């Protein structure tokens, strides 16, 4: 069985192949999310604590959290669930998934280091994998570099070098939610537009109410005139 161990602190991961079944027996009958002491796997993992995060069986079917079985099962899967990505809106599909209980039929078991042990693991805990991209949002850039609101975040955005043919240039992401004079001007303009539209609507409503009152008074006067004529004709 292969153990795909990740170390989120350094952003690194490494696969260890273990042929001796007695060493991996400690994982059997454990579920996704449970923690396991690494000393039972080998002396190099002494002091380490691993959390089971997933895996695949020998046919490539992924383990699914919440399925309390050590075998494969077919489930009707929908949007926003693991092991399935719908291609159309509202699409559902019955797919085979492996249960969340670890067994000997697994080819790869994914583990996360929760607690670091005594000695370093070569290529895993002794190396740091830098993030390829830096923060993009203005507030996150400020938080990342410890800037105040007065500092210009555009000077601190992380640029990366790109080589195209013989030409080398730098690229930087577009800073999101950056407050600039243009943005404030646009906001003021939109607010003024809103106020202007509301004022125009109020004026139009007042004009309509005035016209309606005029029409109603005219109709009332007409009806009163008709009643007066009718009363005078009856008297005659």
UniProtKB/Swiss-Prot annotation:
Superkingdom of source: Eukaryota
Family affiliation: Belongs to the eukaryotic ribosomal protein eS6 family.
GO biological process: maturation of SSU-rRNA from tricistronic rRNA transcript (SSU-rRNA, 5.8S rRNA, LSU-rRNA); translation
Claim: Metal-binding is one of the keywords in the record: no
Crosslink site: Glycyl lysine isopeptide (Lys-Gly) (interchain with G-Cter in ubiquitin): 116, 131, 149, 214
Gene3D superfamilies: 1.20.5.2650
One annotated GO molecular function: structural constituent of ribosome
UniProt-annotated location(s): Cytoplasm; Nucleus, Nucleolus
Identification of the protein by name: Small ribosomal subunit protein eS6A
Record organism: Saccharomyces cerevisiae (strain ATCC 204508 / S288c) (Baker's yeast)
Subunit structure of this chain's protein: Component of the small ribosomal subunit (SSU). Mature yeast ribosomes consist of a small (40S) and a large (60S) subunit. The 40S small subunit contains 1 molecule of ribosomal RNA (18S rRNA) and 33 different proteins (encoded by 57 genes). The large 60S subunit contains 3 rRNA molecules (25S, 5.8S and 5S rRNA) and 46 different proteins (encoded by 81 genes). Interacts with snoRNA U3. uS11 interacts with MPP10. Component of the ribosomal small subunit (SSU) processome composed of at least 40 protein subunits and snoRNA U3.
Keywords per UniProt: Cytoplasm, Isopeptide bond, Nucleus, Phosphoprotein, Ribonucleoprotein, Ribosomal protein, Ribosome biogenesis, rRNA processing, Ubl conjugation
Known function: Component of the ribosome, a large ribonucleoprotein complex responsible for the synthesis of proteins in the cell. The small ribosomal subunit (SSU) binds messenger RNAs (mRNAs) and translates the encoded message by selecting cognate aminoacyl-transfer RNA (tRNA) molecules. The large subunit (LSU) contains the ribosomal catalytic site termed the peptidyl transferase center (PTC), which catalyzes the formation of peptide bonds, thereby polymerizing the amino acids delivered by tRNAs into a polypeptide chain.
A Pfam family assignment: Ribosomal_S6e
Note: Present with 66000 molecules/cell in log phase SD medium.
Modified residues (Phosphothreonine): 163
One CC-aspect GO term: nucleoplasm
